[in-house]
Structure formats: C-alpha cells, structure tokens
Amino acid sequence: MGSCVLCSIVGQGSNSLHVTYQYLDNVTTHLISRPGEREKLPFTLQDVRAAIPAHCFQSNLWRSLSYLFLDFGMIALLYLAAAQINRAWFFPIFWILQGTLFWALFVVGHDCGHGSFSRYRRLNHFLGHICHTPILVPYHGWRISHRTHHANTGNIDTDESWYPVTETQYHNMAWYEKLARFHLILFVYPLYLFRRSPGKQGSHFMPESPLFRPHEQKQVLTSTVCCVLMMSVLTAIGLHYGWGFLLKYYGMPYLVFVVWLDLVTFLHHTDEDIPWYRGKDWYFLKGALSTVDRDYGIVNAIHHNIGTHVAHHIFITIPHYHLLEATAAIKPVLG
C-alpha cells in the first residue's frame, strides 16, 4: 500500500472538530490490512434489518412534505427579516442561519435522491430539483454519483469521496488539487461537482461523463439546465440590484451551506480508527459500518438528524425522521 495522506480527526472521541493533515505510514496500512479483517462480521445484513421496526422503512408523503415546507418557510422568513432589519450587525447572523437552512434543504433533496422521501419516483425527482436547484446542486448528477458512493463506501479503490490517497497519488496531484483537498476542504464542494475527487474523471454537470450510463444522460442534462437557469436568475439579480446585494443575500449563505456540507460529510467518513478495505476484504456491510455517527447538538433537528449516518448507510430507504429509532434498534446487534 505504501504511505497514505489521510484527513483525520484528532481529539477525544468523535465529537472533536480539530482537523489536521498528516502522513500515516504504519497506521494507515494497519487500518487497511488489519489482521482478521478478512473474517466475516458476526452478524449479517438480514440480522441488522430484522432488528429495525418495519414502519421505519415506510415513508409518509405528508410528513416528508412538512419538512420541505418548513425549510422553505423558514428560508422565506429569514429573507423577510433580513430585508426588514437591514443592519450590518444582523447579516452575519443571517448568513449562518440561512446557510444552515440551505443545508437542511439539501438534506430533504438527499432523501428524494434515495427514494426515501416518498414511494413516488417522479415526485421524488421533481421535488429533488425543487430542493437542489436553488442551491446550485445538479440533482441527478449528484444523485447518481452519490449512489456510487453508497455502493462502494469504505472501499479505498472505488469509493467516490473522502478516501485516503497514496503518497504516490499525492505527489502526482496538481498543486491546486492539493490546495483544495488538504487546505480548503470546507470549501471544495462546488469544485467537486465540476471535477470530482482527485484521480476521478468526469463532471456532475456533463451528461457524457463516465459517472453516468447512457440512459441517465437525459436526466443529467435536465439537472444541468436547471442549474444554468438558476445561475441566469442570480445573474439577473446581480445586474439589477448589484453584485454586493447578491453576495449579501445569496453568496454568503451559499458559502455557509458549502461549509456545512463539506464538514458533515468529512466527519461522517473520517476518523483515526476507521478502516478502509480493498479487493475481497471489502463487502457492503463492512463498508457501511466504516461510517461514523456524529452529534451536532441543537443543529440535529434543524438538519434532519443527518448525524445518524451508520443506519442511513446500511439502509438508504429509511426516511430521515425514522433514523433515530432505527439507530437505537440496531445498536444491540452491532455491539
């Protein structure tokens, strides 16, 4: 394997947010090829599923819609408050709150992408665009690459994102790739949408990208057109009201949203003790269990309990409002 560059959490337990970057030789190799890792887990996917109450796998359309309406309603109220107050002291507060709600809206669209929002596929895709287009996420492009991530979680060779890279890969990376991945990791999501992760080819916006199958290209094009239209609207706002206005009311909340997305996904897939597998050492359940649950305190309810990540990775069709119950149910099985 050789030495790896790994973004890792340093501190006591999984609640620490102090991030460092370090070369890990023996440690990373140990995590990838730890003795005994080839052995099967003492429980199966069926064992885990059997522990979860059946209703946890059922989505409720009206309940799902209530979260969608709540997020859009709060976003609208914050815009109204910002316009009414219109004081310099309020805008930093507005940026943090609104950016957090943009992130919450992304999570609702995330449920649409997994099919856990409702049992109606076309409705899921329509509402997924309603959630993701305003925050410049190409819904289908993201949905399909995210599917790849879930199908390969914990596989160092095929996972879509947040995987450690070898020292050789590190030295072969362009300077801007090193800058983005190891120094600006909380701001790289827009770049990832255009370029993917280091060593991966393609773009979430381009239908002919190797990310997508031929029959998916029209869907990807639809999402790209939606994002282009959104950019046109934002450009028109900037031209009419001024670029400072656009930055103040959209650009800064969008930046906070990007930080939330990168921070949360980083924390769910990075820890000093997380193993990475390759080849026959990997299989789906082992990979899914290499994710990490995180507690975000009062933000848990705002961003729809996305911190319950292990249960989500094992069963992507569980709606976010059932993940807490599902997590509690599987703990005795997982040990």
Model-predicted regions and their roles:
Residues 2-99, 132-252, 321-335:
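Non-catalytic, topology-defining segments of multipass membrane proteins
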Residues 99-109, 138-141, 186-201, 250-278, ...:
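Transmembrane alpha-helical segments that form the membrane-embedded catalytic/substrate-channel core
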Residues 102-121, 142-155, 264, 268-271, ...:
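Acidic (Asp/Glu-rich) catalytic motifs at the cytosolic membrane interface
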Residues 117-136, 159-177, 278-295:
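Juxtamembrane helix-capping/reentrant segments at transmembrane boundaries
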Residues 125, 173-181, 230, 271-284, ...:
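Juxtamembrane/interfacial segments around transmembrane helices
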Residues 127-128, 187, 307-311:
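Residue-level signal for cytosolic alpha-helical hairpin/rod architecture
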Residues 204-220, 266, 270-298:
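Multipass alpha-helical transmembrane domains of eukaryotic endomembrane proteins
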Residues 300-333:
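C-terminal, well-structured subdomains that either form a transmembrane helix-short loop-helix hairpin
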